[in-house]
Amino acid sequence: MLIGGRAHAVAEAEFIAQAGFPFAEISIRTPQEFKREVASFRRLQDRFGIFYVAHGPEEVNTWEPEKLRADFLPLIRSLLDCAAELAITVFTLHFWLDRRFVADDIAAEKIEILKAMTGHADKCGIKLCIENLSEQVSDFPPVFAVIEGLGMTLDVGHGELLTARNTAYEFAAGWPERIWHVHLHDNRGGDTVEDDLHLPLGEGVIDFAAILGCLRKQGYDRTMTLEIATAALKSGKNIIEQTWQHEAPAA
């Protein structure tokens, strides 16, 4: 299991590399921005031996599949091509499918768009991973049933939103073979975008020992990104390592 940090800019990736983390999760938002930054990211790779996972741009036109197909799909294809230039093998995507807010007919069209994205990711040698935003575990079976190559990024902090019990427990138990990456940050519950606080670990209400125990019991042994401020990364890494080794039960 490898722990990395979230980098929204090259300077943050450099901080993460200098701090000794094995990887950074970088934002790839537009091909133009990527072309300006790719040389800097490569220098960090050469200097520190760091590797990258990627986070795509925010979804737009959530309820307009025709615009997603016309604009967002080609954008994601281009960004997957960019990611391949840095030998990135995991690409996280926001693509909201919470059936409490996205109608079934729109969700069905979005799943077809997601299938096309996943097909392009496969050609690039990249695992495309849909991230849980507010979705329940019941929202994902129709997706995974028709998109064999799609992975999941389990966001533990998001799991605390719009629910009485963190959904990470059910995701870890129900879809262990799909979970390719994990996001870690603390939250205090709530039901709005503003409630997604991305707090340092220990400043919210999430029971990380219990959730990490579920993941470890299912045999998870891939990457985890701390999606918190860079100043809190080292302490967050220590918390996760100690919890994983001493508190989370072994499989």
Description of each model-found segment:
Residues 1-80, 84, 151, 249-251:
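N-terminal pre-domain/capping segments
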Residues 1-2, 9-17, 87, 137-154, ...:
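Histidine-acidic metal/acid-base catalytic patches
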Residues 5-7, 26-30, 52-58, 93-95, ...:
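A cross-domain feature marking catalytic cores of carbohydrate-active enzymes
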Residues 38-42, 68-77, 106-115, 164-173, ...:
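Charged helix-capping and loop-helix junction motifs
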Residues 60-66, 99-103, 162, 190-198:
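A short acidic, helix-capping loop that chelates divalent metal ions and anchors anionic groups
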Residues 22-23, 51, 89, 127, ...:
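Residue-level detector of anion-binding/catalytic polar loops
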Residues 42-59, 111-121, 147, 208-213:
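Alpha-helix-loop-beta-strand connector modules within alpha/beta enzyme cores
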Residues 64-151:
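Active-site acidic/histidine proton-transfer and metal-coordination neighborhood
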